[in-house]
Amino acid sequence: MRVLAPLPYSHTLILYLCMRIVPLSEGAFTIDKTKDFLPFDPATDDLQKRATGSLLVEIQPFLVITEKDVLLLDTGLGFKQDSSLQIHQLIRKAGVDPDSVTKVLLSHLHKDHVSGAGQKLTDGTRVASFPQAIYYVQQRELEYAIEKGFPSYEPESFAFLENLSNLVKLEGSGLIDSYIRYELTGGHCPFHQVFHIEADGEHAFFGGDVAPQMNQMKSRFVAKYDYDGKKCMDLRQKWWHQGQEEGWTFLFYHDIKNPIWTR
């Protein structure tokens, strides 16, 4: 395993023998009971001045490049900068053409994870942000999210998926192309899933919002914002111990300081 010389934080990348992992940092935000994501600059902003109960999180999809695929793990908030999707810009800064993304793996459909999956055209229609890619989502998560709606979900950002010809609706747990293992976990929301990417002896693990930050892996607590907080706690403990024993590389979507951790 080789670690490249550090790049600016948001574009840090690690190169493995067969796998390159790039955190695509969209920035730090606070979120409270309103479910709104407010930009937060650690250098100038004071968390104590935000609404009571505000959580400080990073929004951080991941690009995983293997010998077979260019994978995108979740898609961020869907913000635009200079009329271009922020996630497209971040992928280009990593030296990759967004059109080369072959698979979009969605852990669940909360807005901070799926809003970059599509983009709105001038006529108001929404199309796939990665038209060459196959999108993967749990079928019951899509059905549940559309039924549940706001504020937990924003169907406007993902309803287009239903009519997408290159959408694969997953059921339960299974395997994609013999090396991407998806696991239906529930926990954070009823039909949340996580991904294990295993190739040539390397094992990258993306726990979505069941395992969003490294510090949560090291302590036992039940989060009020989870659908089943106890299940999330138990899964984190299980993965953390197993991952350390087996040498997993953990990808943390909401971690400000540690987007990637490995032994």
Regions found by a protein language model. Give the residues of each.
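Residue-level marker for buried hydrophobic side chains located in beta-strands
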Residues: 71-73, 105, 135, 204-206
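Metallo-beta-lactamase
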Residues: 85, 92-96, 129-184, 189-262, ...
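Pre-active-site segment of Zn-dependent metallo-hydrolases
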Residues: 39-61, 65-103
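Active-site metal-binding loops of divalent metal-dependent hydrolases
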Residues: 26-28, 75-78, 109, 140-141, ...
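Core dinuclear metal-dependent hydrolase active-site scaffold
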Residues: 18-26, 60-65, 71, 172-200
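Active-site metal-binding motif and surrounding structural segment of the metallo-beta-lactamase
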Residues: 83-136
